[in-house]
Amino acid sequence: MGFKSSEESKVLRSRANLPTSRRTLEPITIDQIEQASSRIRGSVLRTPIVRLNTDTDMEIYLKLENLQPTGSFKVRGASNAIALAGPEVKSRGVYTCSAGNMAQALAWQAKQNGISCSAIVPDNAPETKLRAIKRFGAKIIQVSFDEVWKVVTTHRYGPLEGSIFIHPFSDPRMIAGNGTIGLEILEDIPDVDSVVVPFGGGGLTAGIATAIQERKPTTKVYAVEPETAAPLAASFSSGRAMEVKRIPSFVDGIGGKSVLPEMWDMVRPLIQGSIVCSLSEIASAVRLLVERNRVVAEGAGAASVAAALTGKAGKRKVVCVVSGGNIDTAKLSEILSGDVS
């Protein structure tokens, strides 16, 4: 089912048989997250938390990362990464690979600092995200999703070897920046019972869960994935980092082909498991956010709300991280009219 109890957690750890020749990632510390919070203050928005207007008795809150300057949480990690990149970044430039949001965030930060930026994006990236990347001055390199995923797993792209690669989710600077969201959630709702986080590569989940584990370990953290690509749920079920078949959908910001082993090692001790939602549930959440709260969220951003509404993350105080709002207006119109694809 993609969940773990405390006993199941022990079993999963003992059963995991991950390959030894893989990248390793040191756990992020609360000090790194707090330093990132100070470092990016003034560069990013401290986003509000509002209650979801719903007819249910559930107490659901929305952490509105869609209000960030580039429309997603990625600007936090990108700001932290650029600040820590070193003096050579000016001459070498930076690049990343992204479905759109990371590329926008890095391009925006690079532009603020006079740094050249390139973005490797999948050839089916939403036009809204492509326009924003261009507006921020980055060079776009469109390739197949498989080629993007190859850059994700190898951390390199031959034609850009002279530039500094900033990984979209397994870079410690990115994860620490993401963790600042967890600090803010606990500052605003200290008695929160659970937090639901969209899971793409794991950097957002790892950062937020680390902050919450350190500051309020009784609060539970859940990931959410779409049914069209749920490698984390498969990994929890099997006890090791798994690769799954990925079906493209309007939920383009989350749902990869696999969980990188280094991210699996980091995330699995920190969260309860992954809630898998159908495209219909996520589309309904997109509509609900618009109709009840006047909030525009992309599929990935609305997935956390869809997961919370299932009740699987608990029925007390639940905070949903609305990770982004970069959705094509045409696609939003289709979803609002009841079309799901």
Tell where the protein language model's regions lie, with residue ranges.
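PLP-dependent amino-acid enzyme catalytic core
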Residues: 3, 13-341
